[in-house]
Amino acid sequence: NHVNCGGINVVLTPGRYNSAYYEHSYLAKEADARLATSADLEVEGGKLYFKNYNGQKIRVGAVYRRLDDDFLDPLEFRGDSLIGVAGITSAYRAGNVAIMNAIGNGVADDKGIYYFVPKMIRYYLGEEPILKNAPTYLPYYDEDKKYVFENMEKLVIKDVAEAGGYGVMFGSKMSREEIANLKNIISEEPRRFIAQELIEFYDIECLIDGKLAPRKSDFRAYVIKGESIRLFNGGLTRYALEAGNYLVNSSQGGGFKDTWIVGEPK
């Protein structure tokens, strides 16, 4: 409401077939906002409107979008986008609608940032990181590139612009031809990739087709910042549905469960 340009608040979702649609619905409900797809929105006279079920148009003052930049506005970015809103960028430029997560503000989603996080902690805080990153290499630097090329068979290579488990390549599962081709691509676009040591995920027992079976999993912890900072006694466990698969992302078919730590903290 502090940045609303006049009108209702909207959570823009790609639609019910998106793997995180339930989350989008929950966010809209908790934020007292309308959940909308591109079909529900229209730009007219440089302003954004929500089209109600009875045909009424309601002015939109702020949008929290749950889709990538490329798909946001087919007039500005990908012309084949069916989930974006034509003209929303122009309305934003004119100051007629606020986009809470503005275009281009996802710099921290760039996987290349992983490489610099420990360095940022040392530079800005003068401290050593308490939690270690997975050893990360940026082939933009010659020394890292040399190591990546010599050890690609045991590394995980990631396209920095991708998310949700897309653009992740396991050197151990690639053929010699695929590795040679990837090296050529990295040589042409070294800033586009990072490489990481493979971290062995913990196996948890999952109920698959009525039987317990091990699946790779990871755990996401949450830090709560209020008057003080504390670690939440729980988190989110994500797990792969296929045996031996390391991709636990929901967009890759992975599952997730709330996880609670029972007992008093020591």
Predicted regions span which residues?
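Domain-scale recognition of functional cores that engage charged ligands
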Residues: N1-K266
